[in-house]
């Protein structure tokens, strides 16, 4: 689950922490244009956001 990437609006987010007390995963988001070539190359195999 850690380092799983997903998209929220125009933000690319990744799961980066786990809270053992609550059992919840935490994530951070970076504002990266979805059609940006670098972002596509980096994330396309993970979650197919550039289809």
Predicted regions and their residues:
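Acidic, low-complexity, intrinsically disordered interaction modules
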Residues: 2-51
């Amino acid at each position: 689950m850690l380092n799983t990437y997903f998209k929220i609006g125009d933000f690319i987010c990744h799961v980066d922490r786990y809270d053992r007390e609550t059992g919840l995963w935490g994530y951070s988001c970076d504002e990266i244009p979805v059609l940006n070539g670098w972002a596509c190359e980096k994330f396309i195999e993970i979650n197919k956001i550039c289809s």
